Regions:
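A structural signal for short, well-ordered beta-strand segments
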Residues: 45, 85-89
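ATP/adenylate-binding site constellation spanning eukaryotic-like Ser/Thr protein kinases
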Residues: 42, 84, 115
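Conserved long alpha-helical elements within nucleotide-processing catalytic cores of c-di-GMP signaling
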Residues: 4-27, 38-42, 46-47, 54-62, ...
Length: 132
């Protein structure tokens, strides 16, 4: 959350330290060996959790959120600070683009309702059947 503030306060090198810290957390023991995490761009990451229910994925997201919140990161000038993150969770339903869009909507709900939380995407409405 407020990643731009980190860059504006301590510079892009410290922003990179935050991104590397989060990447190391994702590669560490917070995810299972068959989970897959990757950076989408900027400060956005995606985590694929195969064989996981929406409730289990939300719990994993909460574990990640808490771990980052409790971390202490050191800026280039030696200042120690903490960061938080908002997480949007969406079960795979249909194609990957639709799932990412649902996760993104849940992420923005988390940001718009106070940040530093995990939000599970609401089920997509069923599309009306097409007639020939």
């Amino acid at each position: 959350d407020h990643f731009k503030r980190v860059n504006d306060t301590w510079g892009h090198a410290t922003g990179d330290v935050v991104l590397v810290h989060l990447a190391r957390m994702l590669k560490g023991n917070l995810l299972r060996s068959h989970d897959l995490a990757g950076r989408l761009g900027g400060e956005e990451f995606a985590v694929l959790l195969p064989g996981t229910t929406a409730q289990e994925a939300t719990a994993i997201g909460e574990r990640l959120r808490r771990a980052l919140e409790q971390s202490h990161i050191r800026a280039g000038d030696g200042t120690s600070f903490q960061v938080t993150m908002s997480i949007g969770v969406a079960p795979l339903q249909g194609d990957a683009h639709a799932t990412l869009a649902q996760a993104d909507a849940a992420l923005y709900e988390a940001k718009n309702t106070g940040r530093n939380k995990v939000v599970l995407a609401q089920p997509a409405e069923a599309a009306p059947e097409k007639t020939p």
